[in-house]
Amino acid sequence: MIRRKLTITALAVLLSQAALAQDRDVVTKEYDDGGVYEGTFRNGLQHGEGTYRLPNGYEYTGDWDEGEIKGQGVARFPNGSVYEGQFAQGKPEGMGKITFADGGTYEGTWRDGKITGEGVAVYANGVRYEGSFRNALHHGQGVMTNPSGYVYDGTWVNGTKEGEASITYPDGSVYEGKVQEGEREGRGTLTMPDGLVYEGTWHDGQIDGIGTLTQPNGDVYEGALSQGRRDGQGKVTYANGDVYEGEFVDDRREGQGTFIGADGYRYEGQWEAGQIEGQGTVTYPDGSVYEGEFSGDLANGEGKITYPDGSTYEGDWVDGVIEGQGRAVYANGLVYEGGFRNARNHGQGVMTYPDGYRYEGEWQDGQRHGQGRATYPDGSEYVGSFVEGQREGEGEIAMASGFRYRGTWEDGEMSGAGVANYANGDVYEGEFVDGKREGQGTMRYASGEEVTGEWTNGALTDRESMTTPETPEAPEGGEGEADTAEAEAEPAATD
């Protein structure tokens, strides 16, 4: 009985060893789908190590577990990709590396046959990504480096840059802030290699919204921006101390704005295309104030300026210069109204002095020049020609004393040929020099007497003829007295 049991036991052991030996044998098996397996089996299932090939070119070599690809192995895919690493349930699972046909690689964790978890991907174009993946897409925290020098270090969502990030650009610029759908969006800061810094809001990858822009030269802008350009309400503080606060359009001052210079200059008003244009008010460093129209940064059109001493000018301006028609009132009470050129009286105009003197007529380069009428404080009036501020040429004066002269003038004085009517009725017609009878002339006295001859310094010095009216004989010495009367009656004709 005992011998029989030993025999049965020995037989069982032999059969078991035979089966084990059979499981360890490398067997080649072809399946209905055309697949071919070459490797070991256990209990009729692929188990251990084996190679499996499909007609489409797929090939797997590695560990099997009861008919399942599981463990370490190498898979070659029809598209030329090669995966080497861990498997489970016939798929890459755990740590593994795949090399794609184009040369790109991924090494890291896999889940359910997909690139999911932490890993490093190097793409055929040289781009390198290290970080989190989900379903073969960048997802979570990761760093992408481009051969050009572009580096993105931040969060990703399903392959898209999204969330907080730090981006370094090929030129050395650095952005730190929010990213949405691959573009800079929300709050962020950009620092450029040349020193430019922008801190503020972004939209669609562009500077857009409210922010602070610091230029390399030290100028600082705070306010609204659009598409990277100043647009809307804002304030610029310049490195030299100047300040502009107001509206911008397309990166230039436009609309209403105030500019304050470090030197005390201040402008408040309208702007266009970066220049002072339209209505506005300027206060100059010396205290002068201009209010009116501007064009091209200069007073142009109608405007009024008030100077520190109280003087004013109101009228036309051209390119920052008083030119055209206007009215000037000076601190000493003098008033001029008329034409101007290059800030000087020019053309037709009227000048009135506080003492009552008034000139109306032509002007040139700030002086009375041409035809005009001068009225003096005592009521005297001159009508005629002026040259460089003086009576010169043909003119007539009527004095308050009753004296009247019509003739030529030189350097403000009666000089040349003319006719003088004296208050006592005497009339002289002839030559004058420096306001006095000088040269050839005829005096017709109110008495009817007429004398012709040479005159010197206002007196008759060489009588050529004399006509006496039919009157009683004159007293002895009367002729001399008449000459004296003539000299005394002559006025001092001045401006």
Predicted features along the sequence, with ranges:
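Extracellular beta-strand solenoid repeats
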Residues: 51, 74, 97, 120, ...
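N-terminal segments that cap or nucleate solenoid repeat domains
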Residues: 21-59
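Conserved anchor residues at repeat-unit boundaries in beta-strand-based tandem repeats, strongest
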Residues: 36-47, 59-70, 82-93, 105-115, ...
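Bacterial N-terminal signal peptides
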Residues: 9-17
